[in-house]
């Protein structure tokens, strides 16, 4: 396919993800005030933990009330504990313990653990209107795990005279760090073009610091210069969605490699995991 537009670059990335275990979710399903995809959270819990969900329905006197009460518990936990904690440790509603993510078991011998891991719902959302302060503002791509936004990406294509520098500038100037999706939900933000990737874990207007997320000119772990290895077909940055965002790798990264120290989130560089 001839890639001539930013939207085509975006579509190509999405197409790869959808062919490898991700789902496409509608931007309209996002609750801006809560900062979640509520129905996806409920569907994940129903699929992975049917008994606890039935307990919640019984204790709250019906499914509609259980849904409302449980989502409030999730939002409160995200607001007070943070996304990583909520993904890694259960939330409790009316004495019922519920997990919001399952990580890969050490072996495949436990059928129930494997089934729960496979129930994780990874979603990609394009052009998400996320902002309460500026409803017209939209993000090129948002990655979601079981209804919780975990990463954003701004995608640029040099063929439209835009590159990774423009993506970083967009984060610095056009994105409000106080919007809930940035201040209390997502963990990392990627600026991406076909040749280079940069990332940051914290938006702070002009003070935002981006770090390179490239492999190096000779590939990860090899001596070379900045950038990425040359390719004859495809994109030099395809490792981002083919390897980093690969379903098992992404869940492993969320489960083991991201660290939170106070208000600081430590996200590993490409060569560190």
Predicted regions and their residues:
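ATP-dependent helicase/translocase motor core
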Residues: 2-273
């Amino acid at each position: 396919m001839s890639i001539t537009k930013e939207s085509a670059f975006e579509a190509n990335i999405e197409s790869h993800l959808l062919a490898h275990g991700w789902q496409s979710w509608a931007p309209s399903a996002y609750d801006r005030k809560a900062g979640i995809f509520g129905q996806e959270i409920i569907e994940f819990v129903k699929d992975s933990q049917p008994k606890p969900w039935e307990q919640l329905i019984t204790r709250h006197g019906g499914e509609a009330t259980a849904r409302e009460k449980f989502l409030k518990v999730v939002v409160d936990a995200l607001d007070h504990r943070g996304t990583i904690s909520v993904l890694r440790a259960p939330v409790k509603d009316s004495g019922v313990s519920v997990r919001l993510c399952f990580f890969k078991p050490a072996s495949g011998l436990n059928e129930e653990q494997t089934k729960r891991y496979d129930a994780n719902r990874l979603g990609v959302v394009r052009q998400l209107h996320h902002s309460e302060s500026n409803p017209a503002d939209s993000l090129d791509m948002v990655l979601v795990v079981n209804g919780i936004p975990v990463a954003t990406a701004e995608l640029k294509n040099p063929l439209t005279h835009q590159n990774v520098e423009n993506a970083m500038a967009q984060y610095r100037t056009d994105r409000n760090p106080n919007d809930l999706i940035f201040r209390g939900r997502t963990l990392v933000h990627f600026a991406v073009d076909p040749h280079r990737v940069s990332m940051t874990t914290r938006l702070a207007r002009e003070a935002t610091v981006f770090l390179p997320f490239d492999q190096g000119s000779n590939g990860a772990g090899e001596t070379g210069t900045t950038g990425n290895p040359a390719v004859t077909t495809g994109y030099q940055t395809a490792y981002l969605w083919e390897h980093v965002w690969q379903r098992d790798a992404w869940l492993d990264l969320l489960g083991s490699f991201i660290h939170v120290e106070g208000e600081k989130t430590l996200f590993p560089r490409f060569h560190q995991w």
